[in-house]
């Protein structure tokens, strides 16, 4: 019979609860370990294991004594220190090992793991055991990428930090994974910001950075086009190359060599090389065209030691309209275009670099692709989602040419990137490229109207990084659940929801038939002829746009309140995008209200009852016009701050002038409305709507 004395009963009860607590702990721990953690990119193979506590800090070992491996260890340690995790001899051991070292071979053998042939260039194995955490790779690149995954698998901070126990085998689907950044239509980043870009690209396993130059690279042989303060110097380029090397990022410069050269060809010294006067296309038949190209690329090759140079050659719209008109009539547009690319290839052959070019010719003259040199690389570009991307890729693959794919972050001409379009475009195009055997991906950023902020683009950049590393069709929904936690350290999920709200705001405008939240809408005067037409279309969407933008602002504020967020500049840029979206819609609402209210006051000015309220209503209308001045003024300050966090002052005044013009417009209109009120007080008459610049018919 059991002993049920009071003392023993107490012991039994304590034992029961301890056992229950232990069972609950084991159950929760086991449940937690079955949850695949958020990772960008997602690894190919993942198995959960028991978590490792980092209560005593870490001790990182890279015994190969290789310079690159030592850098990977230092980079990892710096990241962990930012989380309050100390370096200590008593801490959890982290081993960064090469697979051909005795320690690496032993670690793999004990776990019955291996690196197969596809893993050798950039792949890695990562696993935890009772002895610590191991990253084993064949190359410095693989070891570095494994260390980047280690960073993402840490939860908590300081003494509460832990490492997600696991086994990972991972390697990329595409050899080259990059970002193409427009440095020629407005923003020119500072060297320090470019270094930040390199660090962040590498953290998400991107290995190519392609700066785009029209006239913004400084050349000793041709110094005129590159404006001081608005261009990249040789010294900056050399510093960036050196900085990128240990991060395993290759810089692939693009210098337009055919089209998009307006800011070169407007100089008198180069005017004779233009296809048409003050145009943008270099005339192939001019004797000075090829020497100019050779001078540019010879200097580029001396500064950028990577295996690739990008010659651009897209959108040569003026070809055949000027100096080559007769030749194009005789031979055809495609033949003249292809011939010039072949001549550029021959001229630059002594540089021993592979030439990338934009794949326009496949869209326009697919039959001529076979005439191109086979060692050139076609960069097929397209920025919309499609059911099939074969027409952009097949002409090159059928001709035996190597291809890269170039989707886009859809930032251009927008107050915030349209990620509805961008993510679907990347998902489909990158998967199609992998299927077609494309070796690379360049995710494009364009600044067509000069208002782009790079900090707004990280959402699309990270999805492109994931989709080019991961095989097949990448899951957009999974990425959207992971982004905020991985990029910003946001455990609340609020920033993920804020991104979705901004996507919904874009979608509301698309449904209304006004494309999406374009910069042009932000600047458009609702009382202009175009503005009145747009106001009719946009009116049904305005409330939905504002509710989504304001929801995003609320979620951003909540995420900030919850704790320390990483990448605060990107959070600020998201807030700016949301505020500009909200104001865009508010502007159309307010402008329509002013029109409708003034027309009603004007029509009823002889009504005895209505006359009692004219002065007060006119005072209110003047204030409503100043609301629009205030909206432009507030976002002006936010935009300027965001710009200067990443860019040189060059070009900023052009955007500030847009803000100042918009503010002045509504200041003048407010003053006219105030004057109309004064006229009423003095004479009890009102000026006509036309005399105040108010449209006759209210925007409906």
Over which residues does each language-model region extend?
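A generic structural motif
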Residues: 64-66, 185, 384
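Short, internal active-site loops enriched in acidic
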Residues: 100-102, 257-258, 315-318, 361-364
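Hydrophobic h-region of N-terminal signal peptides that target proteins for export
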Residues: 22-32
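Feature activates predominantly on carbohydrate-active enzymes
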Residues: 113, 117-349, 356, 405-407, ...
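Bacterial N-terminal signal peptides that target proteins for export
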Residues: 2-21
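Substrate-binding groove of N-acetylhexosamine-processing glycoside hydrolases
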Residues: 39-41, 46-48, 53-56, 70, ...
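Secreted/periplasmic carbohydrate-active enzymes, especially glycoside hydrolases
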Residues: 3-5, 84, 143-144, 152, ...
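Contiguous, structured surface segment used for ligand recognition
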Residues: 33-177, 428, 451
């Amino acid at each position: 019979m059991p002993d049920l004395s009071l003392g023993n009963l107490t012991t039994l009860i304590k034992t029961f609860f301890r056992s229950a607590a232990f069972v609950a702990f084991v159950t929760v721990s086991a449940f937690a370990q079955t949850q695949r953690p958020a990772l960008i990119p997602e690894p190919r193979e993942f198995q959960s294991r028991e978590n490792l506590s980092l209560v005593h800090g870490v001790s990182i070992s890279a015994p190969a004594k290789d310079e690159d491996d030592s850098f990977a260890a230092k980079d990892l340690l710096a990241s962990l220190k930012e989380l309050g995790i100390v370096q200590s001899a008593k801490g959890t051991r982290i081993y960064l090992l090469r697979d051909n070292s005795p320690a690496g071979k032993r670690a793999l053998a004990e776990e019955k793991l291996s690196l197969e042939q596809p893993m050798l260039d950039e792949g890695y194995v990562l696993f935890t055991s009772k002895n610590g955490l191991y990253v084993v790779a064949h190359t410095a690149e693989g070891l570095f990428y494994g260390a980047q995954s280690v960073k993402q698998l840490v939860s908590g901070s300081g003494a509460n930090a832990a490492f997600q126990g696991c086994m990972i085998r991972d390697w990329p689907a595409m050899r080259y994974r990059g970002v193409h950044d427009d440095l020629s239509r407005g923003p020119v980043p500072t060297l320090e910001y470019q270094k930040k870009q390199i660090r962040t690209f590498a953290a998400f396993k991107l290995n190519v950075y392609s700066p785009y130059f029209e006239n913004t690279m400084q050349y000793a042989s041709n110094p005129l086009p590159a404006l001081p303060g608005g261009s990249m110097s040789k010294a900056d380029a050399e510093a960036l190359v050196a900085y990128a090397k240990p991060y395993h990022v290759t810089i692939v410069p693009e210098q337009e060599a055919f089209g998009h050269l307006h800011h070169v060809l407007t100089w008198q010294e180069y005017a004779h090389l233009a296809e048409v006067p003050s145009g943008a296309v270099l005339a192939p038949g001019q004797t000075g065209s090829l020497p100019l190209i050779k001078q540019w690329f010879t200097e580029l090759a001396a500064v950028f030691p990577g295996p690739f140079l990008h010659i651009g050659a897209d959108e040569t719209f003026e070809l055949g309209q000027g100096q080559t008109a007769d030749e194009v009539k005789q031979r055809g547009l495609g033949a003249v275009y292809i011939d010039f690319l072949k001549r550029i290839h021959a001229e630059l052959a002594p540089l021993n670099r592979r030439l990338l070019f934009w794949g326009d010719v496949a869209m326009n003259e697919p039959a001529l692709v076979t005439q191109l040199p086979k060692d050139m690389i076609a960069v097929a570009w397209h920025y919309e989602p499609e059911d099939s991307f074969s027409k952009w890729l097949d002409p090159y693959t059928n001709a035996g040419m190597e291809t890269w794919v170039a989707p886009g972050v859809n930032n251009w001409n927008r107050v915030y990137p349209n990620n509805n379009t961008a993510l679907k475009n990347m998902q489909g195009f990158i998967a199609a490229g992998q299927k077609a055997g494309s070796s690379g991906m360049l995710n494009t950023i364009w600044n067509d109207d000069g208002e782009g902020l790079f900090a707004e683009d990280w959402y699309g950049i990270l999805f492109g990084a994931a989709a080019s590393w991961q095989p097949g069709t990448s899951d957009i929904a999974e990425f959207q659940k992971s982004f905020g936690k991985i990029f910003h350290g946001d455990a609340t999920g609020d920033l993920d929801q804020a991104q979705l709200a901004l996507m919904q705001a874009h979608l509301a405008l698309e449904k209304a038939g006004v494309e999406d939240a374009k910069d042009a809408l932000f600047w458009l005067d609702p009382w202009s002829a175009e503005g009145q037409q747009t106001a009719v279309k946009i009116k049904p969407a305005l409330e939905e746009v504002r509710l989504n933008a304001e929801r995003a602002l609320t979620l951003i504020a909540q995420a900030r309140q919850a704790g320390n967020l990483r990448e605060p500049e990107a959070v600020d840029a998201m807030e700016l995008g949301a505020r500009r979206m909200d104001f865009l819609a508010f502007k159309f609402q307010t402008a329509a209200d002013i029109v409708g209210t003034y027309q009603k006051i004007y029509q009823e000015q002889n009504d005895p009852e209505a006359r009692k309220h004219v002065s007060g209503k006119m005072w209110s209308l003047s204030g409503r016009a100043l609301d629009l001045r205030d909206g432009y003024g507030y976002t002006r300050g936010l935009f300027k701050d965001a710009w200067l966090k990443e860019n040189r002052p060059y070009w900023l005044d052009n955007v500030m002038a847009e803000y100042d013009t918009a503010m002045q417009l509504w200041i003048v209109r407010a003053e006219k409305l105030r004057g109309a009120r004064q006229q009423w007080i003095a004479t009890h008459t009102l000026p006509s709507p036309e005399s105040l610049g108010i449209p006759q018919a209210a925007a409906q």
